[in-house]
Curated annotation (Swiss-Prot):
<dbReference type="InterPro" id="IPR050088">
    <property type="entry name" value="IspD/TarI_cytidylyltransf_bact"/>
</dbReference>
<dbReference type="GO" id="GO:0050518">
    <property type="term" value="F:2-C-methyl-D-erythritol 4-phosphate cytidylyltransferase activity"/>
</dbReference>
<keyword id="KW-0548">Nucleotidyltransferase</keyword>
<feature type="site" description="Positions MEP for the nucleophilic attack">
    <location>
        <position position="222"/>
    </location>
</feature>
<keyword id="KW-0414">Isoprene biosynthesis</keyword>
<dbReference type="InterPro" id="IPR018294">
    <property type="entry name" value="ISPD_synthase_CS"/>
</dbReference>
<comment type="pathway">
    <text>Isoprenoid biosynthesis; isopentenyl diphosphate biosynthesis via DXP pathway; isopentenyl diphosphate from 1-deoxy-D-xylulose 5-phosphate: step 2/6.</text>
</comment>
<comment type="function">
    <text>Catalyzes the formation of 4-diphosphocytidyl-2-C-methyl-D-erythritol from CTP and 2-C-methyl-D-erythritol 4-phosphate (MEP).</text>
</comment>
<dbReference type="InterPro" id="IPR034683">
    <property type="entry name" value="IspD/TarI"/>
</dbReference>
<dbReference type="InterPro" id="IPR029044">
    <property type="entry name" value="Nucleotide-diphossugar_trans"/>
</dbReference>
<protein>
    <recommendedName>
        <fullName>2-C-methyl-D-erythritol 4-phosphate cytidylyltransferase</fullName>
        <ecNumber>2.7.7.60</ecNumber>
    </recommendedName>
</protein>
<dbReference type="Pfam" id="PF01128">
    <property type="entry name" value="IspD"/>
</dbReference>
<keyword id="KW-0808">Transferase</keyword>
<comment type="similarity">
    <text>Belongs to the IspD/TarI cytidylyltransferase family. IspD subfamily.</text>
</comment>
<feature type="site" description="Transition state stabilizer">
    <location>
        <position position="15"/>
    </location>
</feature>
<feature type="site" description="Positions MEP for the nucleophilic attack">
    <location>
        <position position="164"/>
    </location>
</feature>
<dbReference type="GO" id="GO:0019288">
    <property type="term" value="P:isopentenyl diphosphate biosynthetic process, methylerythritol 4-phosphate pathway"/>
</dbReference>
Amino acid sequence: MQATAIIAASGIGKRMQLREGESKQLLEVGGFPVIYHTLKAFQMASSVKAIYIATRLENRSILEELAAASGFSKLKAIIEGGKERQDSVYNCIRAIEEEKRLTGASAEIILVHDGARPFIRSEEIDEIARLSMQYGACVPANRPKDTIKYVGENPEFFGETLDRSKLLQVQTPQGFQSNLLIQAHEQAELEGWYATDDAALVERFFPEQPVKIFETGYHNIKITTPEDIPVAEAIFSQISTRS
């Protein structure tokens, strides 16, 4: 089984309250940029044969130097990101398709991951790839710890409480058989339809396709706000102690 990874790393990190030109993927955790940890996990995953990163152009040289210095040999291309995350992923998909046209190289599975999730484990990546091959699609998730409620018609008040036992917090990498994901993105591009994750595109355009759940722990956080940095440092410290 061969998987290609797409890493979305072009977000400007508004909620991180960074200065103009800064990128949350380049913030340091454990003495290394966030994206270093992310790339290392995919480099170590035996199922992954190639990695494409979507990022801002001003980060290209930094990522090239990081990959060369760290021996990230699977990094195939650094692609310019789009206006939205979905555009960035689609830019990578088009690059993957162009590589296939030129060389005949193709992947059975495409994994789409948030660059700001640095603690996914290589064995989890391999298992998601395996389940994606078996079921067509697989998405990692964990169970919410908090009670979740709808906001009422009056947005200053709550509506009903949701059944927490039927809810999951969705994460990445999300895995798909390649043709399925490519067709979903192509259709979304034609219709101008946007979703917050890739599984939602598959759900919309291929409603008959089941999406396998892969439950993870709470280590696979997405670094989104300043409060996430000390949490990430604590997770890194715990991981380093165990290894």
